[in-house]
Amino acid sequence: MAIDENKQKALAAALGQIEKQFGKGSIMRLGEDRSMDVETISTGSLSLDIALGAGGLPMGRIVEIYGPESSGKTTLTLQVIAAAQREGKTCAFIDAEHALDPIYAKKLGVDIDNLLCSQPDTGEQALEICDALTRSGAVDVIIVDSVAALTPKAEIEGEIGDSHMGLAARMMSQAMRKLAGNLKNANTLLIFINQIRMKIGVMFGNPETTTGGNALKFYASVRLDIRRIGAVKDGDVVVGSETRVKVVKNKIAAPFKQAEFQILYGEGININGELVDLGVKHKLIEKAGAWYSYNGDKIGQGKANASNYLKENPAIAAELDKKLREMLLNGGNGEQPVAAATAEFADGVDETNEEF
């Protein structure tokens, strides 16, 4: 239905006034003068990139990664940093837990010489540092480890045992309101690592919840629930963890998908193992008995040997990665995809939250 001429003139005048007062681009038609594609950064896991539906985590947004202890939360964020640094991006790590291991980070491919790191004294200080880095426009990825360790100043200055109901939740709520717009303008990805707590007295449903109040849940474009589901063994020796990640919330593609991969101790995500599994599943790699073949050439007997072959031949691994992304992600470039994986509803953290 056409808008009459007087309304069009009035609208044009209003738009002109808004742009004059607030700057060009402050208001626009959704399909005009802007890219609708979402720029993403790889998570370091091909199956998780596919499950996210956009080829990775979205720039300019807030992401929450939560799970039990030793489930791989920090490892996953370090893999994101390594992937971002390979693209020439600047990254920062806000270590509120004071537990970052630079030797481990280096093993995962992180350039620790160019990684900005802060160990703030209070939660307010950590969030102000995040805001300052974002407003600089020079930092592409910021990791906060973790929300549970963002202790309000009043709690630190008080006595142990003092009641500080809702302080952390209010602090996070104020920070989200301030950060969300700045992150979008600077096209900076902000990832919060969070811990799980148990709600007391829950008889039915999931008693798990995350710390820091409800604000982060609402402002996050992506929420990932990461869990350790088994052990990776070399003989009788445990060498890693079988890990499952559920996409509990996703504003950039369909949610509720999940990915499974291995995290090897001292190495990080076993991307070559993922390539073998996905290659077999989508018939790019042939499997006859225990032997794996690619383009007619045998690459190994058993998954471990096939993975080692890809590790020793990065050009073939890159070719296989590219083919899988083109096959499984729409757009063919691995950056603006819709996942082809089967949707599975997550039984993730309950949306009701309490302050701990």
Curated annotation (Swiss-Prot):
Q: Which compartment or compartments is the protein found in?
A: Cytoplasm
Q: Which family does it belong to?
A: Belongs to the RecA family.
Tell me the name of the encoding gene.
recA
Record flagged with keyword DNA damage: yes
Among the Pfam families in the record, one is RecA
The record, for HAMAP family, names:
RecA
Give the UniProt record's GO annotations in the biological process aspect.
Answer: DNA recombination; DNA repair; SOS response
Q: What is its main location?
A: cytoplasm
PANTHER family hit by this protein: MITOCHONDRIAL DNA REPAIR PROTEIN RECA HOMOLOG-RELATED, RECA
Protein name, UniProt field: Protein RecA
Q: Please indicate if the UniProt record lists DNA damage as a keyword.
A: yes
What GO terms fall under cellular component here?
A: cytosol
Q: Which UniProt keywords apply?
A: ATP-binding, Cytoplasm, DNA damage, DNA recombination, DNA repair, DNA-binding, Nucleotide-binding, SOS response
Query: Where is ATP bound in this sequence?
Result: 67-74
Query: GO: which molecular function terms?
Result: ATP binding; ATP hydrolysis activity; ATP-dependent DNA damage sensor activity; damaged DNA binding; single-stranded DNA binding
The record's NCBIfam families line, in alphabetical order, gives:
tigrfam_recA (TIGR02012)
- Briefly state the protein's biological role: Can catalyze the hydrolysis of ATP in the presence of single-stranded DNA, the ATP-dependent uptake of single-stranded DNA by duplex DNA, and the ATP-dependent hybridization of homologous single-stranded DNAs. It interacts with LexA causing its activation and leading to its autocatalytic cleavage.
Organism listed in the record: Yersinia pseudotuberculosis serotype O:1b (strain IP 31758)
